[in-house]
């Protein structure tokens, strides 16, 4: 009986030791995930997925700027700049640029071509697989939008007359709960969906673009069945020539703590009454786990 107890005790200690070892083991990065930074500060990440050859190639360009950094006179600039970019060819022939955007939306899971929030702007392209030519065109277009965009009275008027395809995050910045959540926040009064003030100050819009759209504040992400080395070379060739450097830090979004009292919010967007239990949370989760 005593021997049995000793064996059980020994086994339990071994199990505890094993569990402790497993919990202490550091997560290893995926070797298929490549990343780098160009000489101008432009960051890129590429995840090759040869095990999923039929998946579309997902391309995202994130710019660390949003409506929170706008002054009163600049209200609407952060939303309008992607809108203006989407009306331009980005150095591509007109029909070629049009074909690129027609093919860059996933019919099964469509995303808006651009999203603007309080502290970031995001361009989204979803390309058909095995189309390296389209990927090259997409990178070329993004590089043009990132630092070579034409900002003239004619270009601005053309963009204002066209459809606004830029979405915001949150999707509805006027929604009752979100307006309640913004009370006491630094984000209040900096609506990413704010319309552009008329008449447009072209010089001020151009200065805003060149001040905030700098390569050291951009991150490009490519995921799909691609050749990582070839894509990295293409990124260096396409984005390496972008100029500019951030001289002013961006404003940091913050939310005030939620009060621990119930609240009733009326909205026309919900047809049936609902009861929600909310946990307090920061504006965004931690994005870098390394």
Regions found by a protein language model. Give the residues of each.
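Gram-negative bacterial Sec-dependent N-terminal signal peptides
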Residues: 1-23
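M16/MPP (pitrilysin/insulinase) zinc-metallopeptidase core fold and M16-derived inactive scaffolds
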Residues: 58-126, 172, 187-192
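Solvent-exposed, polar/charged alpha-helical surfaces in well-ordered, non-transmembrane soluble domains
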Residues: 75, 83, 98-99, 103, ...
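Acidic/histidine-enriched alpha-helical segments
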Residues: 97-99, 148-168, 227, 246-260
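An aromatic/glycine/proline-enriched structural segment found at the starts
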Residues: 188, 219-284
């Amino acid at each position: 009986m005593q021997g049995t107890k000793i064996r059980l005790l020994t086994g339990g200690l071994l199990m505890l030791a094993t569990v402790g070892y497993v919990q202490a083991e550091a997560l290893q990065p995926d070797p298929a995930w490549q990343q780098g930074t160009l000489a101008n500060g432009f960051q890129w990440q590429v995840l090759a997925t040869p095990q999923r050859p039929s998946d579309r190639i997902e391309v995202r360009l994130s710019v660390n700027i949003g409506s929170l950094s706008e002054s009163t006179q600049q209200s609407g600039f952060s939303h309008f700049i992607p809108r203006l970019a989407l009306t331009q060819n980005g150095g591509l022939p007109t029909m070629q640029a049009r074909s690129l955007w027609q093919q860059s939306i996933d019919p099964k899971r469509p995303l808006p071509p651009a999203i603007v929030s309080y502290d970031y702007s995001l361009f989204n392209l979803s390309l058909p697989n095995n189309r390296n030519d389209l990927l090259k065109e997409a990178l070329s277009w993004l590089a043009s939008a990132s630092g070579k965009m034409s900002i003239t009275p004619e270009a601005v008027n053309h963009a204002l007359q066209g459809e606004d395809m830029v979405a915001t995050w949150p999707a509805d910045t006027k929604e009752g709960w979100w307006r309640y959540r913004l009370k006491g926040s630094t984000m209040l009064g900096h609506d990413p969906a704010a319309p552009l003030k008329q008449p447009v100050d072209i010089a001020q819009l151009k200065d805003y673009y060149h001040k905030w759209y700098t390569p050291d504040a951009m991150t490009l992400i490519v995921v799909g069945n691609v050749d990582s080395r070839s894509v990295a070379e293409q990124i260096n060739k396409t984005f390496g020539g972008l100029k500019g450097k951030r001289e002013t830090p961006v404003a940091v979004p913050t939310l005030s703590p939620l009060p621990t009292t119930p609240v009733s919010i009326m909205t026309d967007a919900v047809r049936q009454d609902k009861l929600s239990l909310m946990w307090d949370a920061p504006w965004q989760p931690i994005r870098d786990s390394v």
